[in-house]
Amino acid sequence: MRRTMRYHVLQQSGLPHKHARATASGEDRMSNAPKNLSTIVLHAGHRADPNTGSVAVPIHQTTSFQFRDAEHAANLFALAELGNIYSRIMNPTCDVLEQRVAAMEGGAAALAVSSGQTASAYAVQNLAKAGDNIVSSTDLYGGTWNLFANTMKDMGIEVRFVDPTDPEAFRAATDDKTRAYYAETLPNPKLNVFPIAEVAAIGKDLGIPLIMDNTAAAGICRPFDHGAAVIVYSTTKYIGGHGTSIGGLIVDSGAFDWEAHPKRQPYLNEPDPSYHGAVWTQAVKGIGPVAYIIKARTTILRDLGGAMSPFNAFQFIQGLETLPLRMERHCENATAVANWLAGHPAVEAVIHPSQQSGVAKARADKYLNGGQGGLVGMVLKGGKDAGAKFIDSLEMFYHVANIGDARSLAIHPATTTHSQLSADEQEATGVSAGYVRLSIGIEHIDDIKADLEQALNKV
């Protein structure tokens, strides 16, 4: 692994600082770790480069790292010593991003990968193989739905879809081959906040970890605080924030007991033939509670190769530094847009947590802190034709497939992001013919409303 990750997980485990002196981020450490988001995203994982004193995180654009001697190399490959080997598996720039997001989420360690899709796939593949299954919420991003409904099935991993509004549906779909539960915190496009604590508690009793995609709720929800075991991110979205780079992250809480139900989690509790027969829950005990993430790094990432580039990691570090400020504006603008659209005659329905009531509102209030997200959905009265006309009439909004950009974005999911889904699958995920997804940016709210109004007037 890496010296910097060792520092982080040892500190998380309460071990003395003397065990983690040599770090790629330097020894200039603050005596008290920052506890507030706005400080964590600026300081966690890096103070100054030990060689140059650079305050900005250096881009380590290299494939390989020099070994001190033959013994050092052998120890690294045997996990007897932590350090950098090859940038497909670990890189000092990526390491800072990993430490920073792990600290942001209150987790033990993280793994940077090439995209959000890679993060979702690896998070599952780290626990499930052919013949196994996971239980997933139906409320998913279209790309994740396709991954689970088709590609995972081709790999022999069954994904059982259940209604996320009923936590007990996860228990009902579970059998002795169920390895994980999966859901999105603020699912796109329905935007109904997932009952994290309820499903996590069910999973804990059964030895099943809850994997949460927190992409749309970065900075406003901490799933680990509610019992989730693993978080995945598309860093492409709000963490990056400027539409410049593709990337993903897997974050390990370090709190899930993988040994409590060894038959439920065999790939962490039985010898792994791909790594000298290592039993992961035992092999990493001297490092910290990071069996899940170390296995993901040293087997799944090693073999499938979906690594994040150091340059992209640098871009995400830059974005992360302003995440709290941007999310405040995203959320403020999105709520204002949702309230305004609710009174527009061309709009049949508005989808946003601010417009919800009952259980859905209670969950949004419980799990979202500091805002209700930057996404707004609306259903236009004219259906598909109205959706197309509206999209084509926008002037300031960009018509793109991304979300979480500083700029305002719009798309018609039924004919784009969810077009590979059947009509029934589209309905299950919350996409209707007239549904338009808006990713509200950080522009002035008056300019956002003006562009929406002129486009709606043409529908």
What are these regions (language model features)?
Residues 26-84:
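N-terminal glycine-rich, Lys/His-bearing helix-loop that initiates the first secondary-structure elements
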